[in-house]
Amino acid sequence: MPGKIENGTPKDLKTGNDFVSAAKSLLDRAFKSHHSYYGLCSTSCQVYDTAWVAMIPKTRDNVKQWLFPECFHYLLKTQAADGSWGSLPTTQTAGILDTASAVLALLCHAQEPLQILDVSPDEMGLRIEHGVTSLKRQLAVWNDVEDTNHIGVEFIIPALLSMLEKELDVPSFEFPCRSILERMHGEKLGHFDLEQVYGKPSSLLHSLEAFLGKLDFDRLSHHLYHGSMMASPSSTAAYLIGATKWDDEAEDYLRHVMRNGAGHGNGGISGTFPTTHFECSWIIATLLKVGFTLKQIDGDGLRGLSTILLEALRDENGVIGFAPRTADVDDTAKALLALSLVNQPVSPDIMIKVFEGKDHFTTFGSERDPSLTSNLHVLLSLLKQSNLSQYHPQILKTTLFTCRWWWGSDHCVKDKWNLSHLYPTMLLVEAFTEVLHLIDGGELSSLFDESFKCKIGLSIFQAVLRIILTQDNDGSWRGYREQTCYAILALVQARHVCFFTHMVDRLQSCVDRGFSWLKSCSFHSQDLTWTSKTAYEVGFVAEAYKLAALQSASLEVPAATIGHSVTSAVPSSDLEKYMRLVRKTALFSPLDEWGLMASIIESSFFVPLLQAQRVEIYPRDNIKVDEDKYLSIIPFTWVGCNNRSRTFASNRWLYDMMYLSLLGYQTDEYMEAVAGPVFGDVSLLHQTIDKVIDNTMGNLARANGTVHSGNGHQHESPNIGQVEDTLTRFTNSVLNHKDVLNSSSSDQDTLRREFRTFMHAHITQIEDNSRFSKQASSDAFSSPEQSYFQWVNSTGGSHVACAYSFAFSNCLMSANLLQGKDAFPSGTQKYLISSVMRHATNMCRMYNDFGSIARDNAERNVNSIHFPEFTLCNGTSQNLDERKERLLKIATYEQGYLDRALEALERQSRDDAGDRAGSKDMRKLKIVKLFCDVTDLYDQLYVIKDLSSSMK
């Protein structure tokens, strides 16, 4: 087995010693904070749980009182000026949960003030009114309900709203996504039999507040463990509210949380308590994984926390959760990793037996959706096993799952246990760096083929590059302390990887600036990044991340060698030459050298993937065309524009668009070199195109495109049959693409129309070229059947692949971003996107023609400048320079209208979405603009150099 990845040595011995002392202090304080009965917890206070604890009444000697009046006062102190509680920029759902629960608590206290006499009814009424107004405002713009990470939201929010409606004596709260919430509620409830909750432990026990009045809480007392319902203060509070028999153990638990939690008696209640196993494993693993050595931080604290984990795994039969009796794969895997780092390894076999699924590991026994970070934690724990080969199947499974997740993630990778995309990004960089290290050393080389290694390398490269590209000027990432730590830890790990040799100075600069910001950052600034029912911070864990980031950033790093076995990371000579060409374009001339080189390297990972599909549709080697050098260029056009605009579209979308670009070039060549000559009679080729498209639409079973129908061509030659098969393969690859079939019927219809027009335009172009080639003069097209305006808006424009590619992209957005809904739903949006498509297509044709004048003249192909509108002006013949100047002016005119159409589309999309305009509305516009940027880049490149293969 190859040696471990060395962290390096401190640049400054005194600074290093300071961090070591701080790390040992953290370990000691965490261990000493551990209570032998109630455990350990440094999670921040949460309004949601505080509100539920504030609603617990208790009757003593026939006198009813609020059990925790300090919680009520905490709610008064934390209400914002706009009437809300818990508003966060990263999640709307948490604010709705906090505000709804706090308003409910105030309503309960307003109806029965009991012993709390220092708040007037007028003040209470005003606070409740402001709270309800805020809640309605939040519900009206709620757009992350389907994407929410928060536990039990499908149960909790409907229950809260129902309780509020009853207390306020008002009809139902109406808001745009209510039907979505109700559907989610029904689907989730369908997975549970409430009667079974009385027997076996169930995840519902974590959210009993959603089942007040629906369950007999007196039958749930046996589920209490050390006074809590699954370590949830809000669920435990609901149990005390709903049970007819008082439970002293539950009261004692909540009193301990009140006194010893993050609120320290001020009324604030932690959202989860305890988090013993979570904190022990995260603190140890975070400190030892990349920053500190075991020798540096060994002591009573480290040994004590390690012992807690060992005993928990022993007592709970090999699988643990964040707290006792809450088993999950996350905490189990992290504990295994932590213990391996302190040289006390525990077998992962039971974890595998309990949590391994068909294609990934589940966090719990059942869950609505899988977790990327859970699988990365499993992978990291397995990579530390001494008998690595025994776990090859699971390593392969989790690596493949992670690659697929990254491949399909649009903009930022997302996970349900952490609100920041930087957390799963950091874990991916850590895990895949380790995977590459083991591949280089031969330990895992047999597991992954070249394509798989390519995707592993691509994932790391993109993860790190996007972290670099999104760093703020002050050195932080959005001003968040813990998230900045995640970013630094990922970048520090990347310094070991050879892919980043060309940009090591930039990478180190990012680390240094992050280090400086982090050192000056106050420990009191909270970063509520972890998710449960709402969002919270874990104090000791946040401190561990800060120390690990500071320590690792201060270490000298040996030469980067990891990843040397991934040859696709080395750009080809064609790409190197291409960079000089791209430098001349208006889009990329302002870019720093490192940024351009980074996109070139990222592009190189896509080239082998494209090469593997190079002849999947069209035969190449016997066609009389030049070598397809554009294959190595295509990936950059998409990657470069994607990085330049910081759009970060998914690899799934990027690759499909790259492949479509490749097919666009190949179709152009194939129709000219093969299909046209084979058919001879172009009317027959027109009929064949219609037949192929109609058959593809009517019969999805023809997806492999290898069997052609004999109808209509009873005596056709084998070559005609082969052409029909080839065109069927192409048509299937576009119209029967998996995501196209999952898109809206309207977007599919648009694609079919544009695709049919594109294919027929090729044949019409062949006819035009044939007539043009028979002319005595090649200077002007003497027999056009349309004016130039008509031609460029029909055959000329449709002949380039822009319009149908645009429609294809809209189908991908419909399927993947919008759950099969129309990409552009209103009639106005549909018109405007068609306008964008048309102007982009016309520009593409004009600039393409501008760049290919010499080739078109040589091959006698019709070019824009051959039309009479360019050859003559006021009866005077125009020379070549004059024609080119006029063509550029018209192209500039089209550019202006494209820009205006894009602006109008953006305004209309915002107006149609109203207050609920959310991330998906913005994303689709970003992707449309990215498509237009790529079109613009091709246009600029055509002006500099003709990119098409020449016909021999």
UniProtKB/Swiss-Prot annotation:
Domain note: The Asp-Asp-Xaa-Xaa-Asp/Glu (DDXXD/E) motif is important for the catalytic activity, presumably through binding to Mg(2+).
Residue interval(s) of motif DEXXE motif: 668-672
Protein name: Ent-kaur-16-ene synthase
Family indicated by similarity: Belongs to the terpene synthase family.
Biological role: Catalyzes the conversion of geranylgeranyl diphosphate to the gibberellin precursor ent-kaurene diphosphate in a two step process.
GN (gene name): cps
Pathway participation: Plant hormone biosynthesis; gibberellin biosynthesis
Key word Magnesium present: yes
Keyword tags: Isomerase, Lyase, Magnesium, Metal-binding
Source species, domain of life: Eukaryota
Amino-acid positions noted as binding Mg(2+) 3 in the UniProt annotation, renumbered to this chain: N848, D849, S852, D856
Enzyme Commission designation: 4.2.3.19, 5.5.1.13
MF term (GO), any: ent-kaurene synthase activity
Cofactor(s) recorded in Swiss-Prot or TrEMBL: Mg(2+)
Catalytic activity: ent-copalyl diphosphate = ent-kaur-16-ene + diphosphate; (2E,6E,10E)-geranylgeranyl diphosphate = ent-copalyl diphosphate
One example of a Gene Ontology biological process annotation: gibberellin biosynthetic process
Coiled-coil ranges per UniProt: none
Binding site for Mg(2+) 1: D668, E672
Presence of the UniProt keyword Cell cycle in the record: no
Residues that, per the record, bind Mg(2+) 2: D668, E672
